[in-house]
Amino acid sequence: LEQDDNNEIRAFVLNGESIKSLEKLKCKIYYGDVTKKETLLPLFENIDDKEVFVIHCAAVVYIKTKYNPLVYNVNVNGTKNVVDKVIETKAKLIYISSVHAIPEKENNDLIEEITDFNPDEVHGLYAKTKAEAAKYVMNAVKNKNLNACIIHPSGIIGPYDYGNSHLTELVREVSNGKLFATVKGGYDFVDVRDVAAAIITASKKDNKGECYILSNRYITIKELSDLICDVQGIKKIKIVLPICLAKIIAPFFEVYY
């Protein structure tokens, strides 16, 4: 975005959060909280004569089983506040959702984009909040003339992860030789640079009401760990635990972390 001198880039940052990822970028920083609608006001000032695109990617990624009200407040209520402000200012919204907002199919069949979201059809707090938020976006598209599209990335992986996501932590643990075992199963991963490029492309298209899955291919955790070990020149992890055992011990790791 900053490669185009005509673009004015504004970043909305939660108070107290690190801005290390933005330090070398040509953008103006606004501090606030998506759950507090009034803090969004300065972000949308002086835009009457501009074509405005809002990329909403603020969210709390949550994999624990215990209910956390912050997840709902940010992922759902925060999205509602952003949507309402975008409607008011007649901007275009690119909402960054997740593949978890889409119901899984039986036998791990391939999922496809949907436009009708139902939190009751997905599992886990994070998935339910992303589905409910996506539902709000699509309802606003249909009933309030919101110009928006939805992006559904799979597991985002790649460089410049200043927030140390779960996947980045996994890569570091393997790289440092701290994991003695992996688990069966895997995931569909997507490079963060491809996600960024897709978001920019989506902002330029006439795609009101469209949804896009961003993914690559299924990779087992063992395959990923082997690749990391090859790059690092260290011994590969030989122990692979069944997923049922991983589910049993997961609550203990939740307490630990």
Residue ranges and their predicted role:
Residues 144-146, 158-169, 202-212, 234-236:
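Glycine/proline-rich active-site loop of Rossmann-fold NAD(P)-dependent oxidoreductases
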Residues 63, 99-109, 156-162:
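Conserved catalytic-site region of short-chain dehydrogenase/reductase
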Residues 53, 77-126:
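Conserved Rossmann-fold NAD(P)-dependent oxidoreductase catalytic core, especially the SDR/UDP-sugar
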Residues 119-120, 169-190, 194:
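A conserved pocket-lining segment of Rossmann-fold NAD(P)-dependent short-chain dehydrogenase/reductase
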Residues 17-21, 27-77, 85:
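NAD(P)H-binding glycine-rich loop region in Rossmannoid oxidoreductase-like domains
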Residues 198-257:
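Mid/C-terminal beta-alpha module of Rossmann-like enzyme folds, strongest
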